[in-house]
């Protein structure tokens, strides 16, 4: 299976200059490709009849559609912007200095652009989900995050070795890294990113499945805001140690908001603005590192103890909880599910997803009665019966339990 490992790079001065140059080159390729893409699209809209454009679009799926000679000539003169069209044009337009740089950077930039356009148009077709995919835009050198991608990187003598052009005559070294002990060999995919003047590499490696010993144990995990409950206890997703970081984030966000406005108008981005933005990103990075570390340890421990795990298939986007929304996103429901899914495959364990409409909170784990109408438990408890948010009382059999414990037992029943 493919696993992604993110490591911190420690390049020497020579390779640091090389990485900076490759980041600049990738941004140049992206902007050039976007300009060509938009030009081809505009020419196609202006010179091709709408019925011919529709016919060409249908021909992508239906190969039996035939074109007349004049239609073929028009389509050849004004091709559709695709990965192959744009990358071919950029390759023909290469300047001498570009041959000193790896060609994979250009092709990967065009590939990312094609995927970005595809995601943008797919999001516009969705009718039920929120459209949150923006149109591809030109990249600025002032962006806090820069990077490039390649599929020809290797690990040699515990160092990351990037591919270089055959005519490049300058010095080239392996780059030391920290984060994981990786075996020597080829890497399927490598993404280099520069964040806050630090370089990181995300390496996609084909990793064999490491089956853990059988324990014949089962558990269920009920995801709640700020904590996850399971059969042996509770796991805090947002511990107290993050409170100070969230206060710093709030402080830097307010500073940035003030620096965006000057005399009621949009202000220019000053050096101080980018300094504050860098500090804000460092705080976000620390929060992410802390929570990722905790989640990795928790999910790995779960699969070492249990063979079968049941979790809820939560629709986070549809969960509107007013004041709870911020804490909801901080609870990392989506990231938790992602970790559980890939580790189940990695360790050879079974992961069961409960239907998102399964009433684990309203169902009695003792008799199976499901609360409806005014009997339901809400975020404020139950006004009709005077119960609190964390209390579960079955009005049919009289069973009383903690609300989260009752939900865990209902989820656990799905493993039978």
Language-model segments: which ranges?
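Nucleic-acid substrate recognition interfaces
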Residues: 1-416
């Amino acid at each position: 299976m493919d696993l992604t490992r993110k490591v911190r790079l420690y390049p020497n001065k020579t390779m640091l200059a090389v990485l900076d140059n490759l980041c600049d080159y990738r941004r140049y390729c992206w902007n050039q490709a976007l300009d060509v893409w938009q030009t081809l699209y505009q020419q196609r809209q202006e010179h091709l009849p709408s019925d011919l454009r529709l016919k060409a679009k249908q021909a992508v799926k239906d190969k039996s559609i035939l074109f007349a000679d004049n239609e073929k000539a028009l389509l050849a003169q004004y091709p559709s912007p695709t990965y192959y069209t744009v990358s071919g044009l950029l390759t023909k337009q290469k300047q001498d200095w570009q041959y000193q740089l790896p060609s994979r950077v250009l092709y990967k930039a065009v590939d990312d652009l094609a995927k970005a356009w595809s995601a943008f148009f797919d999001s516009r077709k969705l009718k039920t989900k929120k459209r949150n995919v923006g149109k591809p835009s030109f990249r600025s050198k002032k962006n806090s995050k820069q990077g490039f991608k390649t599929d020809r990187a290797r690990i040699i003598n515990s160092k990351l070795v990037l591919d270089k052009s055959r005519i490049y005559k300058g010095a080239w070294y392996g780059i030391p890294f920290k984060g994981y002990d990786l075996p020597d060999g080829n890497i399927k995919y490598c993404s280099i990113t520069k964040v806050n003047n630090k370089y990181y590499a995300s390496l996609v490696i084909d990793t064999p499945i490491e089956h853990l010993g059988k324990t014949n144990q089962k558990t269920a995990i009920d995801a709640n805001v700020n904590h996850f409950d399971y059969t042996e206890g509770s796991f805090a997703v947002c511990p107290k140690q993050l409170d100070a970081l969230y206060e710093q984030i709030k402080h830097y966000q307010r500073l940035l908001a003030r620096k965006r406005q000057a005399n009621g108008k949009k202000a220019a981005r000053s050096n101080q603005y980018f300094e504050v933005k860098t500090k804000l990103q460092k705080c976000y990075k620390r929060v992410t590192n802390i929570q990722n570390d905790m989640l990795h340890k928790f999910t790995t421990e779960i699969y070492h103890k249990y063979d079968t795990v049941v979790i809820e298939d939560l629709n986070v986007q549809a969960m509107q909880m007013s004041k709870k929304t911020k804490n909801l996103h901080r609870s990392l429901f989506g990231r938790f599910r992602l970790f559980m899914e890939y580790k189940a495959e990695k360790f050879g364990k079974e992961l069961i997803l409960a239907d998102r409409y399964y009433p684990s909170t309203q169902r009695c784990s003792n008799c199976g009665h499901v609360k409806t109408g005014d009997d339901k438990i809400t975020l404020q408890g139950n006004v009709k019966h005077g119960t609190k948010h964390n209390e579960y009382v079955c009005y049919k059999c009289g069973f009383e339990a903690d609300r989260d414990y009752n939900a865990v037992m209902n989820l656990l029943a799905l493993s039978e």
